[in-house]
Amino acid sequence: MDNETKATTFSKSTGLPRKRFYRARAHSNPLSDSHFPIPISPAHVDYSLHFPKFVEADNKFIKKVEFADIGCGFGGLLISLATLFPDTLMIGMELRDKVTEYVKERILALRRTSSEGQYENISVVRTNSMKYIPNYFEKGQLSKMFFLFPDPHFKEKNHRRRVISTHLLDEYAYVLRAGGIIYTITDVEELGEWMKSCLEKHPMFESLTQEELVSDPVVELLCSATEEGQKVARNGGQTFRAVFRRIAYVS
């Protein structure tokens, strides 16, 4: 990005990228073949490019990613989680190229303007998480996965495109450690029931109790931290949440 373009697309007052220059379609077809690099295994992901502050002198990466925000949108949740869990590495996964570029520039700008070395623990990658989750994460690597306001794919013939389904939960259970949490939320009641039903039927997940939900500081961010959640709140809309734990074994 040349200096003239950068001056236009970045706010002079905050130093952050202006969202209107990164507009894209609300959703993309997750079953289409997009063109972006795909690692052949988690060992082939160079996370040092995403988290340079967590690389030792001998180029050894000292931490592993633990949180994944699937379909991270404009990165609102990542930004909030970064300061809540400053020692935890987390990555957003987004299919839309312009949105991914915006989140990347937003994170880099926050790193530059932060006086306390914050936001070094978050990053974003453009990928199709419905196809390539096992290419990025090892078995039991993640402790939290987020699916916030995903595309509802209203038509029945398109339900196979939904990011929560029985067969995809098999993959999510693989990369989540025992005790790991899946967070889902939507403003579409039918989709909320769908996601909850898929999780309830899957043998590797159990619902959190009301007491656990109240004590989890992440739960209140599901709406307040995301741009989509804020829009729903402004319009007085309802949200439908399902939060489930990955169990250790099936009895």
Swiss-Prot record:
Record's subcellular location: Nucleus
A Pfam match: Methyltransf_4
Chain ranges passing through the membrane: none
BP term (GO), one: tRNA modification
InterPro entries: SAM-dependent_MTases_sf (IPR029063), Trm8_euk (IPR025763), tRNA_(Gua-N-7)_MeTrfase_Trmb (IPR003358)
Catalytic activity of the protein: guanosine(46) in tRNA + S-adenosyl-L-methionine = N(7)-methylguanosine(46) in tRNA + S-adenosyl-L-homocysteine
Coiled-coil region list: none
SUPFAM superfamilies from the UniProt entry: S-adenosyl-L-methionine-dependent methyltransferases
Functional description taken from the UniProt entry: Catalyzes the formation of N(7)-methylguanine at position 46 (m7G46) in tRNA.
Listed name of the protein: tRNA (guanine-N(7)-)-methyltransferase
Organismal lineage: Eukaryota, Viridiplantae, Streptophyta, Embryophyta, Tracheophyta
